[in-house]
């Protein structure tokens, strides 16, 4: 599923991401834009053999199990396939686990490079939330 910007903002808010660990909703919508273009089916192979999955491009080396990444940790305790569902509940649950890990949203390279330190409120502007 490819979410509309405001539709995604509303879903993320409903699932408790607004100000989760101090990150406003705009940060999450911005990250999703640059990670997946709001597409839950997005996948991306990395040079280390791991794959990133879903709307927030969550990585199989650390966070989910795809059955083929060597030495995978699966810290979210989920198969990576659930991160590709239209329903983003599991992706958000895992994202909360990731952002609580000490490095915050810096875990997402796209957030670090494109969202951090910018006016992320523009990502939710005009949305009825």
UniProtKB/Swiss-Prot annotation:
Keyword Hydrolase part of the UniProt annotation: yes
Intrachain S-S bonds: 6-127, 30-115, 64-80, 76-94
Record localization: Secreted
Annotated ranges, domain C-type lysozyme: 1-129
SUPFAM superfamilies: Lysozyme-like
Reaction equation(s) it catalyzes: Hydrolysis of (1->4)-beta-linkages between N-acetylmuramic acid and N-acetyl-D-glucosamine residues in a peptidoglycan and between N-acetyl-D-glucosamine residues in chitodextrins
Pfam families: Lys
PROSITE patterns: GLYCOSYL_HYDROL_F22_1, GLYCOSYL_HYDROL_F22_2
GO cellular component: extracellular region
UniProt-listed InterPro entries: Glyco_hydro_22, Glyco_hydro_22_CS, Glyco_hydro_22_lys, Lysozyme-like_dom_sf
Keyword Secreted: yes
GO terms, molecular function: lysozyme activity
Enzyme Commission number(s): 3.2.1.17
Leading EC class: hydrolase
Active-site residues from the entry: 35, 52
Primary location recorded for the protein, binned into one broad class: secreted
Alphabetical GO biological process terms: defense response to Gram-negative bacterium; defense response to Gram-positive bacterium; killing of cells of another organism
CDD domains for the chain: LYZ_C
Gene3D superfamilies linked: 1.10.530.10
Keywords: Antimicrobial, Bacteriolytic enzyme, Disulfide bond, Glycosidase, Hydrolase, Secreted
Additional information: Lysozyme C is capable of both hydrolysis and transglycosylation; it also shows a slight esterase activity. It acts rapidly on both peptide-substituted and unsubstituted peptidoglycan, and slowly on chitin oligosaccharides.
Similarity comment: family membership: Belongs to the glycosyl hydrolase 22 family.
Role: Lysozymes have primarily a bacteriolytic function; those in tissues and body fluids are associated with the monocyte-macrophage system and enhance the activity of immunoagents.
The protein's name in its UniProt record: Lysozyme C-3
Species assigned in the record: Anas platyrhynchos
């Amino acid at each position: 599923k490819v979410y509309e910007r405001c539709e995604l903002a509303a879903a993320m808010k409903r699932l408790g991401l607004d100000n989760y660990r101090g990150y406003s909703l705009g940060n999450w919508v911005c990250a999703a834009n640059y990670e997946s273009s709001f597409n839950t089916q997005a996948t991306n192979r990395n040079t280390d053999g791991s794959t990133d999955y879903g709307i927030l491009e969550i990585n199989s080396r650390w966070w989910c199990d795809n059955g083929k990444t060597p030495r995978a940790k699966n810290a979210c305790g989920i198969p990576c396939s659930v991160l590709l569902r239209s329903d983003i509940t599991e992706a958000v649950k895992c994202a909360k686990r990731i952002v609580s890990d000490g490095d915050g949203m810096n875990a997402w390279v796209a957030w670090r490079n494109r969202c951090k330190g910018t006016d992320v409120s523009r990502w939710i502007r005009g949305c009825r939330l």
